[in-house]
Amino acid sequence: MAILVSPSNNTGWGLGCKSMYGGARRLTEHHPVLVRRHFRASWGSKRGRTTVPTVPITDDPVADVVNAIAEGTTRRRRRAERRRRRRQATSAMRAARALVRSARRRLARRGRVRRTRNPVADVVRAVEEATRANPPRRSARIRARTVATVNPLGPRNIYWVRDQSGKRIPVTSRPSRALGYLV
């Protein structure tokens, strides 16, 4: 945290992270001075921001107490209204979060070693899976989805084409029908 020299009456921005930024990450006419990597307001621009208590004083002590309590609650309510509220999550956001959680669970599950009552069989199975020459075949839909996500241009059609060895592979550019590759 950068501690800046603040004005003599301490109304300035140099005492903490929240107030130090002054709400400005960009240069404006209100925040003309660059400090480290953010802009702060010029000298004296934050003067007069504090509110004076407006509790009316009466002869009745009960009314004074009621007024003082009411003033505190309204100030607290105003402060709560000024606070930034968290946006209500839409159904799409909730679905995206659920998708991320399930993907994380799947990744964690994949790393776990399956255990049975026979520890020797567990070790043998783990070694076999680690040294298997052909990894387990992924489904065609997962392969196609992977190809689609790698492409930064957005969603595109996926065509299945046979390569030289005769295996079907997903491609995003449509081959010519005259060549007879499309299967």
Curated annotation (Swiss-Prot):
Phosphoserine: modified positions: S165
Disulfide pattern: none
Pfam families found in the cross-reference section: Adeno_VII (PF03228)
InterPro entries: Adeno_VII
Site feature: Cleavage: G23, A24
Sequence motif Nuclear localization signal, residues: 168-183
Function: Plays a role in the inhibition of host immune response within the nucleus. Interacts with cellular nucleosomes and immobilizes the host immune danger signal HMGB1 on chromatin. In turn, prevents HMGB1 release out of the cell and thus decreases inflammation. Also plays a role in the wrapping and condensation of the viral DNA. May also promote viral genome import into the nucleus.
Misc note: All late proteins expressed from the major late promoter are produced by alternative splicing and alternative polyadenylation of the same gene giving rise to non-overlapping ORFs. A leader sequence is present in the N-terminus of all these mRNAs and is recognized by the viral shutoff protein to provide expression although conventional translation via ribosome scanning from the cap has been shut off in the host cell.
Protein name stated in the entry: Pre-histone-like nucleoprotein
Lineage: Viruses, Varidnaviria, Bamfordvirae, Preplasmiviricota, Tectiliviricetes
